[in-house]
Amino acid sequence: MAAVETRECETEGCHSEAKLQCPTCIKLGIQGSYFCSQECFKGSWATHKLLHKKAKEDKTNDEEKNCVEKEVNTDPWPGYRYTGKLRPYYPLTPMRLVPSNIQRPDYADHPLGMSESEQTMKGTSQIKILNAEEIEGMRVVCKLAREVLDIAAMMVKPGVTTEEIDHAVHLACTARNCYPSPLNYYNFPKSCCTSVNEVICHGIPDRRHLQEGDILNIDITVYHNGYHGDLNETFFVGEVDEGAKRLVQTTYECLMQAIDSVKPGIRYRELGNIIQKHAQANGFSVVRSYCGHGIHKLFHTAPNVPHYAKNKAVGVMKPGHVFTIEPMICEGGWQDETWPDGWTAVTRDGKRSAQFEHTLLVTETGCEILTRRLEDNGRAHFLSQM
């Protein structure tokens, strides 16, 4: 603690001379915070730390307000050759805070966003069979994830920014006592992924206004009571062309046909054969770099679920397995590259890509779609826009 001019100790009931000031308060610019000793400082910590939390929240809100008011759009990567017409809208608003009372995954406060529990399981092909309690935990979290996506869906229209959608997603998560799983996952800066047009996946929400004719994928994962629930849908922004409708419709059909095949005894590698057959029959290609995955207490784990044909995925479906299927289907070639942000995956030829995702539980006779929409007989939102 730093030495300062003489003040009175701020610990309740203590009026001793105070010459020490909280170093965090100095850093945050908080006035006061004087204590007579380390003991008094530690004794006041439970209430004193709330000042730090409020100051950080106020700072984040001020930075976000200033960022929006300035409406500055800077190209973060001068000289980078974009594959399509989409551009990032920088600077990004600051990373949002999650209330301390909400349970957090192990990577939430890691400086690199690293999940130690996932790293421990890295490389294993052993697929966890969930027990009844774990299955119920997954049902609950997937229902919450679906609620959050449905809220985001209502915001999709021309003129809205993906940053505004991310803000709504963040608030919807915390209102449900959920941590938004993408936030700080390997330092991802936002609470959901928003992928527009040629973006395949992992798009970072920013202040670009959605435009009439865009297609937008919103990918939601939430963490609740120790479990992750994951799903995504692609939406039409206003009126879209027939090519966009065909792409999105086919992508959804690829997912649902693959889901129809899920049951005990099916090899995970078979899913890619089903998906690619339907995609190619409609003149589209299947992304190979990104796959579905096991999910439960870990965000990403075994099995690995490729969406392309003749893959070498390991494993046979058994009751109690929980995993995602999330095909990414492209108008042109399947090849991808990543923007310099290290996250945004785009088609190499700049043509559009669409995606849909569900989290599934293998049952004794088939599967349960844990992230199924409750309204409209479970149909995806875009179907009401056709």
Curated annotation (Swiss-Prot):
Assembly mode: Associates with the 60S ribosomal subunit of the 80S translational complex.
Zinc finger (C6H2-type): 6-59
PANTHER family assigned to the protein according to its UniProt record, in alphabetical order: METHIONINE AMINOPEPTIDASE, METHIONINE AMINOPEPTIDASE 1
Protein name per its UniProtKB record: Methionine aminopeptidase 1
Binding site for Zn(2+) 4: D230, H293, E326, E357
Positions that bind Zn(2+) 3: D219, D230, E357
Molecular functions (GO terms): initiator methionyl aminopeptidase activity; metalloaminopeptidase activity; zinc ion binding
Record GO cellular component, one term: cytosol
Binding-site list for Zn(2+) 1: C9, C14, C36, C40
